[in-house]
Amino acid sequence: MAEQKGMDPDTKYIKLQVVGGEVPGATLAQRVGPLGLSSKVVGEDIKKATADYKSLKVHVQLAIKDRKATVEVQPSVATLIIKSLKEPPRDRKKEKNILHNGSLRMTEVVDIARIARSSRSYSNSLSGTVKEVLGTCKSIGCKVDGKCPKEVTREIDAGEIKLPDQ
């Protein structure tokens, strides 16, 4: 695995996609078993760490050092948007490809952009990251301040909406 800045060379990293608030399935045992860890204990740690994202898909990074695993939750922008819409959890097995029809405030979009900027965004500026988040809002189907996210992007480009520098 490629070394990233700030990563310890003695630590093994495993990335998983799990459903928040649930114990991961058999793939966890296959990934952590050879490293000498109990999949049951690690599964419970993941369940506790992802409790805020109940029934949403979320990425988890396990950092394993000296037969101890630390869990870091890395939610995607889409997961953060759905969480801030505060919709009730759905049965993910029955309902697929759901369009979310809620509306976010622009301040919530900026907050999500700040979170995404720290780990996932490739943009040089906060306004670029906000536009990435607005594109995800469009894909999900939600509105921003009651408007289509594409309209809000045009207003940012035209200078009608002022965004903070950082």
Swiss-Prot record:
Q: Which GO terms describe its molecular function?
A: large ribosomal subunit rRNA binding; structural constituent of ribosome
Give the protein name, as stated in the record. Answer: Large ribosomal subunit protein uL11
Task: Give the record's family classification.
Answer: Belongs to the universal ribosomal protein uL11 family.
Q: Which UniProt keywords apply?
A: Methylation, Ribonucleoprotein, Ribosomal protein, RNA-binding
| Positions of disulphide bridges | none
Q: Which InterPro entries does its entry note?
A: Ribosomal_uL11 (IPR000911), Ribosomal_uL11_C (IPR020783), Ribosomal_uL11_C_sf (IPR036769), Ribosomal_uL11_CS (IPR020785), Ribosomal_uL11_N (IPR020784), Ribosomal_uL11_N_sf (IPR036796)
GO biological process annotations for this chain's record? translation
What is the primary gene name for this protein?
RPL12
Record's GO cellular component terms: cytosolic large ribosomal subunit
What residues bear N5-methylarginine in this entry? R67
* UniProt xrefs under Gene3D superfamilies: Ribosomal protein L11, C-terminal domain, Ribosomal protein L11/L12, N-terminal domain
- Superkingdom field: Eukaryota
Name the coiled-coil region(s): none
